[in-house]
Swiss-Prot record:
Official protein name in the record: NADP-specific glutamate dehydrogenase
Entries under InterPro entries matching the protein: Aminoacid_DH-like_N_sf, Glu/Leu/Phe/Val/Trp_DH, Glu/Leu/Phe/Val/Trp_DH_C, Glu/Leu/Phe/Val/Trp_DH_dimer, Glu/Leu/Phe/Val_DH_AS, Glu_DH, Glu_Leu_Phe_Val_DH, NAD(P)-bd_dom_sf
Catalytic activity: L-glutamate + NADP(+) + H2O = 2-oxoglutarate + NH4(+) + NADPH + H(+)
Highest classification ranks of the organism: Bacteria, Pseudomonadati, Campylobacterota, Epsilonproteobacteria, Campylobacterales
Residues annotated as the enzyme's active site: 124
Positions bound to substrate: 88, 109, 112, 163, 381
Amino acid sequence: MYVEKILQSLQKKYPYQKEFHQAVYEAITSLKPLLDSDKSYEKHAILERLIEPEREIFFRVCWLDDNNQIQVNRGCRVEFNSAIGPYKGGLRFHPSVNESVIKFLGFEQVLKNSLTTLAMGGAKGGSDFDPKGKSEHEIMRFCQAFMNELYRHIGATTDVPAGDIGVGEREIGYLFGQYKKLVNRFEGVLTGKGLTYGGSLCRKEATGYGCVYFAEEMLQERNSSLEGKVCSVSGSGNVAIYTIEKLLQIGAKPVTASDSNGMIYDKDGIDLELLKEIKEVRRGRIKEYALEKKSAEYTPTENYPKGGNAVWHVPCFAAFPSATENELSVLDAKTLLSNGCKCVAEGANMPSSNEAIGLFLQAKISYGIGKAANAGGVSVSGLEMAQNASMHPWSFEVVDAKLHHIMKEIYKNVSQTAKEFKDPTNFVLGANIAGFRKVASAMIAQGV
């Protein structure tokens, strides 16, 4: 009854925040076995407190475009929970950004950061600004205007933002530069920085590498591996590119990539150098890959199956959704399973619909939910914070080894929790309960 009461209250209070509802529903319904066995969480109103952000900040961002016209966007930062450490989570610049999207991401971040073993609370922020089609100077002016409002709410031990969709190293650089001018301090207030001013080696690789490490841990328990296996990857940003890179390093065969216009299937395996050239150097579209590689086929989004994504209709052993939320529908899940897919590891945040997740759990495949499988990115952000605090940078090998260790620990924690609650293949339950228990314990200890 406790969970049902919370969900009804949430629906009544925020009727139009569907992404936030989806994230909360997925998380707290899997907490039922814990909540039924321990009534102290209800006594301390932990769910009520957990789903309500500690602070929501919304602000106007005014900036000048290249024609000297004033443009107005909306910025926000949702500081969700700081029970186990300073707020930590990315900034997203995309037209789809609204309160519901940022709250869903912030809520997910709380549980994800709890799993990392590091002292980080959860937050998320961003703007409906679209960097696509903007000049370098326009992006710089927007970032500076955005930081003019945000700077008073963040700090190295208060709230440490990072990048997300639309916010890469370039944008972080402009944001950091403006923060430094405003406060006259050089401190680790942002992660994802360039290597010349406090960034960490292995940061851009971290989410993709970590996702593959987590998938390997899941498969190892079943006496299997990714070596020699065909893998489907969606997206073509940092997460997808470095998922593909790590898959190639361990001898797997990734055959797909995508962007908002369509997807490519390369039967010979993805040419990583060409993909990086198109996406990281030219900032081009994925269809350019098919124009240059005869072994590749391009499918535009208008030719995708109705209610589905063509990436997931390519037969594969393992799937790595690495683009955006709700990119993998129930139709896609059925297709993956009927084509013999044995492993799904989520590089993106909430890429699978709740119905799709239900099918994966029912089929008892190796399913790594995003808050566990993609926690490598924020883990290395935490390691970047540690390097900034000590003023001592670490080598790529040291950071990668620490990342690998963290992903192993996350898997161990999630797997042991699932076994504790008599559902050993349910890593959704394992991840949510493991993440929740740590945060809830800290909240109870700190009082109301």
